[in-house]
Amino acid sequence: MGLPWYRVHTVVLNDPGRLLSVHIMHTALVSGWAGSMALYELAVFDPSDPVLDPMWRQGMFVIPFMTRLGINNSWGGWSITGETVTNPGLWSYEGVAGAHIVFSGLCFLAAIWHWVYWDLDIFCDERTGKPSLDLPKIFGIHLFLSGVACFGSGAFHVTGLYGPGIWVSDPYGLTGKIQPVNPAWGAEGFDPFVPGGIASHHIAAGILGILAGLFHLSVRPPQRLYKGLRMGNIETVLSSSIAAVFFAAFIVAGTMWYGSATAPVELFGPTRYQWDQGYFQQEIDRRVRAGLSENLSLSEAWSKIPEKLAFYDYIGNNPAKGGLFRAGAMDNGDGIAVGWLGHPIFRDKEGHELFVRRMPTFFETFPVVLVDEEGIVKADVPFRRAESKYSVEQVGVTVEFYGGELDGVSFGDPATVKKYARRAQLGEIFELDRATLKSDGVFRSSPRGWFTFGHATFALLFFFGHIWHGARTLFRDVFAGIDPDLDAQVEFGAFQXLGDPTTKRQIV
């Protein structure tokens, strides 16, 4: 046929058997990739420190999704929450990965079978003896089956009725674990951060899908609608399927980037808005104030701050800090976090507390400025010493640490004070091991950033694909130069080009 590369899919245009075959093969490739990628990630994943070296710092991509759906144990004897496991059972990380690979192999064999045995009676129209598909009926079947799967997922898996539940955590990502979720049927179910909405929406959408599927199975479309929307053309199916996919991709790009119950901080890392709004900083401050009100010392109050919470309040965990072409995990950038040094409090020579102004997300460098509680600049690291009035040396700034490894240690040496002031721009200060992975010190994005970028990009491409194929199917007669009501058998499978004189015609 001599088809160009971008037209090769026309070989399955009028061939239902092989159309089915290539879709089964596609499922085999997707499932095989998922299982293989999971095994690769498990081979390189270090579960030893879930607090300072969690999965998202190590660049894991499929493990967070498996964990979100209720898997948390490994055949290696470890659990994602840090405990030792003796009997992980079949539904462990390795078990699920293996199941995907086995399923991929079965789909591969099924695809080959359907490619060889393409001319099945089920695909033949009894009236004409020609291959054809009843597309509205197939639509009803798919809608019904996906509705059953959606309902089953929400009513059984998520609720824990028959299944483990899903990953649920507190608003600050500290206490996450897999647990059953009760459906939220009130207005709170529409809050994207309420896990109960996941159960209720799956149940509601599943019921709707089942009813819609039964409707499309039992009611035929009117002839004018059938012809107007080209319901007999497989390219109509392609166009509307692409629409469903790009719509879903845009939705999940949003829920991932802005945060939601479906994208927990513990599994995918913080969002950039949590840095921009000082989300974790405010919670830390609230806890410290609460400790001081209970007559704890500053040191005791800061020592009660969970290391996990302090680690979230560090700009290196902001997914928007990674560059477009900076490949690799966060650990390959600023290094593996080893320990929290503690919270630095800066004071001038009169003893007034000073606060380092934090670096905004989209800055690579930022001036070191220390302000008082009213936001007035009191000290800085000047660019030109000759004209400086607020230098650390002139103001006599000192720093003392509370909590963490340097608890109770203070420094008055200007060089050391400036070093910690620069690091305080980036949030809480951590000791980072850059030697082990030969980390280059340049921030990387988290899986949250990769997922969002990938899905937003492909959603845009698929949007144009929907427009393209929708236009092709709606205006097929115009593009092909062939009247859709023509009483001739036209070999569209071989050629479908504008006014092609070689297109075979046979009067019926």
Curated annotation (Swiss-Prot):
<feature type="transmembrane region" description="Helical">
    <location>
        <begin position="21"/>
        <end position="36"/>
    </location>
</feature>
<dbReference type="GO" id="GO:0009535">
    <property type="term" value="C:chloroplast thylakoid membrane"/>
</dbReference>
<dbReference type="GO" id="GO:0045156">
    <property type="term" value="F:electron transporter, transferring electrons within the cyclic electron transport pathway of photosynthesis activity"/>
</dbReference>
<keyword id="KW-0602">Photosynthesis</keyword>
<comment type="similarity">
    <text>Belongs to the PsbB/PsbC family. PsbB subfamily.</text>
</comment>
<keyword id="KW-0604">Photosystem II</keyword>
<keyword id="KW-0472">Membrane</keyword>
<feature type="transmembrane region" description="Helical">
    <location>
        <begin position="140"/>
        <end position="156"/>
    </location>
</feature>
<feature type="transmembrane region" description="Helical">
    <location>
        <begin position="237"/>
        <end position="252"/>
    </location>
</feature>
<comment type="subunit">
    <text>PSII is composed of 1 copy each of membrane proteins PsbA, PsbB, PsbC, PsbD, PsbE, PsbF, PsbH, PsbI, PsbJ, PsbK, PsbL, PsbM, PsbT, PsbX, PsbY, PsbZ, Psb30/Ycf12, at least 3 peripheral proteins of the oxygen-evolving complex and a large number of cofactors. It forms dimeric complexes.</text>
</comment>
<keyword id="KW-0793">Thylakoid</keyword>
<dbReference type="GO" id="GO:0009523">
    <property type="term" value="C:photosystem II"/>
</dbReference>
<dbReference type="InterPro" id="IPR036001">
    <property type="entry name" value="PS_II_antenna-like_sf"/>
</dbReference>
<feature type="transmembrane region" description="Helical">
    <location>
        <begin position="101"/>
        <end position="115"/>
    </location>
</feature>
<comment type="function">
    <text>One of the components of the core complex of photosystem II (PSII). It binds chlorophyll and helps catalyze the primary light-induced photochemical processes of PSII. PSII is a light-driven water:plastoquinone oxidoreductase, using light energy to abstract electrons from H(2)O, generating O(2) and a proton gradient subsequently used for ATP formation.</text>
</comment>
<feature type="transmembrane region" description="Helical">
    <location>
        <begin position="203"/>
        <end position="218"/>
    </location>
</feature>
<keyword id="KW-0157">Chromophore</keyword>
<dbReference type="InterPro" id="IPR017486">
    <property type="entry name" value="PSII_PsbB"/>
</dbReference>
<keyword id="KW-0148">Chlorophyll</keyword>
<dbReference type="InterPro" id="IPR000932">
    <property type="entry name" value="PS_antenna-like"/>
</dbReference>
<dbReference type="GO" id="GO:0016168">
    <property type="term" value="F:chlorophyll binding"/>
</dbReference>
<keyword id="KW-0150">Chloroplast</keyword>
<keyword id="KW-1133">Transmembrane helix</keyword>
<keyword id="KW-0934">Plastid</keyword>
<feature type="transmembrane region" description="Helical">
    <location>
        <begin position="457"/>
        <end position="472"/>
    </location>
</feature>
<keyword id="KW-0812">Transmembrane</keyword>
<dbReference type="Pfam" id="PF00421">
    <property type="entry name" value="PSII"/>
</dbReference>
<dbReference type="GO" id="GO:0009772">
    <property type="term" value="P:photosynthetic electron transport in photosystem II"/>
</dbReference>
<protein>
    <recommendedName>
        <fullName>Photosystem II CP47 reaction center protein</fullName>
    </recommendedName>
</protein>
